[in-house]
């Protein structure tokens, strides 16, 4: 499991990322905003950012949701 610190304009939190290689999924959790999402390996790049953004948009303002989505996409791409 990876733990990353997110420091946005209005939100500072920890992001927990767990990779399940057997099921080819990634679980992302942000407890501070009661958010979690399971992502399949076949979603990546701009599609991944958009997918995460659409879920975060319900919880955060547009700018913060986009910035956090970009950060999560970058962190999940790390090997």
Briefly describe each language-model feature range.
Residues 20-45:
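A short, structured beta-strand/loop element
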Residues 8-10, 21, 34, 38, ...:
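Generic, low-specificity signal for short hydrophobic/alpha-helical stretches with a mild N-terminal bias
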């Amino acid at each position: 499991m990876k733990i990353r610190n997110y420091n946005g304009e209005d939100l500072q939190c920890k992001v927990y990322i767990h990779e399940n290689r057997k099921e080819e999924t990634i679980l992302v959790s942000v407890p501070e905003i009661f958010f979690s999402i399971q992502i399949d390996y076949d979603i990546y790049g701009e599609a991944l950012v958009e997918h995460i953004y659409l879920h975060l948009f319900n919880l955060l303002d547009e700018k913060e949701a986009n910035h956090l989505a970009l950060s999560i996409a970058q962190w999940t791409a790390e090997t």
